[in-house]
Amino acid sequence: MVAATVNLANMTWTSLNSNPAISFSMLSGIRNLGMLPFRRCLKPTVIGIASWPPLRCSSVKAMSSSSSSSGSTLEETVKTTVAENPVVVYSKTWCSYSSQVKSLFKSLQVEPLVVELDQLGSEGSQLQNVLEKITGQYTVPNVFIGGKHIGGCSDTLQLHNKGELEAILAEANGKNGQT
């Protein structure tokens, strides 16, 4: 699993170690070429803090040049991100509910792909609007497991308290074909 934050304003992924940065708009293309350092399993893997200049690629601002296509392009990006990563949490750094969900996953030794919306500038609020369109939920955290929308903090904690979260995580791990 990958723990990361995305900074669309600077177009780089950041996290806790010193692996190279990966541009957000390159996710689907790079992953298909086998260059993205994601392991599709529930074991912790971390991609790192930006240590070189971002590669040249189309930016979210470029993708958002027309209002009619920006929503659909961001929607495609969200759908691809959710489909290609077993656990994704759209979060805000200052949100206590987001912190609770991230702590829960950490206690389960699951490191989700974390997208910190408040660190993305205007793209963060655009992504939050796209998430509302897709899920009907505007608040964070917005949790996806195995490509399915789980809900927010209370939904995730409720699944955990009922003993159902681990089974959902195991199923998501199985979908990704690795243990």
From Swiss-Prot:
Q: Which GO terms describe its molecular function?
A: 2 iron, 2 sulfur cluster binding; metal ion binding
Q: Give yes or no: UniProt keyword Metal-binding.
A: yes
The answer, when asked if Iron-sulfur is one of the entry's keywords, is yes
Q: Where is the Glutaredoxin domain?
A: 75-176
Matches recorded under InterPro entries: Glutaredoxin (IPR002109), Glutaredoxin_euk/vir (IPR011899), Glutaredoxin_subgr (IPR014025), Thioredoxin-like_sf (IPR036249)
Q: Tell me the keywords, alphabetical order.
A: 2Fe-2S, Acetylation, Chloroplast, Iron, Iron-sulfur, Metal-binding, Plastid, Redox-active center, Transit peptide
Q: Which parts of the sequence carry N-acetylalanine?
A: 62
Q: Where is the transit peptide?
A: 1-61
Give compartment(s): Plastid, Chloroplast
Q: Which residues form the signal peptide?
A: none
Name a GO CC annotation attached to this entry. chloroplast
Organism superkingdom: Eukaryota
**One Pfam family of this chain:** Glutaredoxin
Which residues are involved in binding [2Fe-2S] cluster?
A: 95
Per the record, the major location class is plastid
Q: Which family does it belong to?
A: Belongs to the glutaredoxin family. CPYC subfamily.
Q: What does this protein's UniProt record list under function?
A: May only reduce GSH-thiol disulfides, but not protein disulfides.
Protein's name in the database: Monothiol glutaredoxin-S12, chloroplastic
Could you tell me which species this protein originates from?
Answer: Arabidopsis thaliana
